[in-house]
Amino acid sequence: MFEHLPPFLNEVVNNSISVDDRDTILIGAIVCLSVCFHNVCGVYDERIVYPNLYLFVVADAGMGKGALTLCRELVAPINRNLHELSKRMEQEYKEAMSAYIKGKKTDEMTMPTEPPMRMLVIPANSSASSFLKILGDNDGIGLLFESEGDTLSQTLKSDYGNYSDVLRKAFHHELVSLSRRKDREYCEVANPRVSVALAGTPEQVRRLIPDAENGLMSRFCFYIIRFKRGIRNVFATSDISQSKNAMFKLLGDKFCHLHEEFVRQGIILFSPLICRNSLLNISVV
């Protein structure tokens, strides 16, 4: 399989140091990048589906699940660009609001609209209302990425942050909504496209999904790193420019440029197989 990877993913997995590391990085990269392909869709079971996936990398302490954290760097430039866009829009909003307050007594001015909070990576410890608000501000697109599964499980157990039902619905791109009577708040996201990447120990999985009856169980892909004895050289390089962090930051910049070109192509639709041994028929709408 690995010899048939697209060039970019091939570059990504070439930075691995072991078989488990390679597998973790590949599946982690696929999940993180899936949230960026919101213009790609297909039909499965007569319903429109998108590439989004939920992943939980499971391993005991010190077994290498930390490799997943490198995959976040692949989408970090896109997330950073969205944050910078939000800051600019917020500054423009404040200036427009200041002008509105000063001139509303004499001129017929329209009150400025508060800008959306643009981001790609959503903090897992967000409240339920904040999570839905951020999704709404970003056209239903978002990535939950946490290197410790407890961050999400503790949030879902709280009164303010229980959005487990939202995650279950978002997996199938169903409409999600929230209403708060106290603040007369209503938020609705019609077509959520959410990806989730988590890492943790088996116990952290049990805290997030206490039993098989929990709907989250069937939504997640679980990659389990088995216990192995051995020691590897953690001082293989002392050159910061050759560190995995630096390598993945460069790959993130590269993907950011690839992504800009990709989204310009419009909606990409995968149609059904025309015969058993044929390739997928791909069309650009």
Role assignments for model-derived ranges:
Residues 1-285:
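Phosphate-handling catalytic cores of nucleic-acid transaction enzymes
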